[in-house]
Amino acid sequence: SAASDVYKRQVLQSQLAYENGRYVIDFEDLEVKLKNPQTTLLILCNPQNPGGNVWSKEELARIGELAYKYGVVVISDEIHCELTDPGIDYVPFASVSEVCKKISVTCIAPTKTFNMAGLQTAAICVPDERLRHKVWRAINTDEVAEPNVFAVDAAIAAFTKGEEWLEQLRAYIYENKQITEKFIKDNIPGVSMVESHATYLCWLDVSDITDNSTRLAAYIRKNTGLFLSAGEGFGGDGKHFLRLNVACPKTTLMDGLERLRNGILSFDR
């Protein structure tokens, strides 16, 4: 939304459908939004944040075909791509088909996986030459095309020498998500964790507790010291959700889960 504000763009959202504890793409709604003659760009989150979906090749192909049909470019935000559960691999949007490749602008960065926020290590991959020139022109116009030397070396080191550490991290985060899901199920009535196979962020359904997650997050923060993200900032049905970061040592996680329980159990509904 920050980018749309800067460039005076109107955002047309195609909300995911929440079904049986997980999110799915509403392709009928997506096509309605894409066929709007004013729609020129689709921003895809792959894997999806905050829901943690790892989109399948078939789902991505269908998105690509629809976007191509209506002349829409797809920016695929793949910043969480390495952070999938063990045994789960994400599918790069541009790899799915020649159609997807032709209309794709893929954004990646070691920022999330290797904790490099602020180093300016983002990269953009644009296979199509004409589209690449447009992107090149835009990032130079905005003067964001010149990373510092430290950022370049840091990104190369992360992508070429970080595999062993990354595999350990993925296993650790997966364990933390399992611990979180079990703790909530056993100790916090009325709260459930959305099925997720990517990211270190848990999306908690608190719809049985409140329809104002901002108020609930503020209450928990004030009364327990636990900082959570209110779901309303993510649009859609976010008013019924909280986002919890579990990329931390297990001792910190357990402390946070106890605070979460105490905050929710004492919350005045």
Enumerate the language-model features and the residues they cover:
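A short helix->loop->beta-strand "cap" motif at the edges of active sites that frequently abuts
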Residues: 9, 69-72, 101-102
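Short hydrophobic/aromatic beta-strand micro-patches
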Residues: 125, 203-205, 245-247
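PLP-dependent enzyme catalytic core of the Aspartate aminotransferase-like
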Residues: 100, 210, 219-228, 234-269
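Active-site phosphate-binding strand-loop segment of PLP-dependent enzymes
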Residues: 16-88
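Conserved core segment of the aminotransferase class I/II
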Residues: 97-174, 182-183, 263-264
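Short, small-residue-biased leader/transition segments that mark boundaries at the very start
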Residues: 2-7
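Conserved glycine-rich beta-strand-loop-beta hairpin in the small C-terminal domain of fold type I
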Residues: 149, 156, 171-181, 193-206, ...
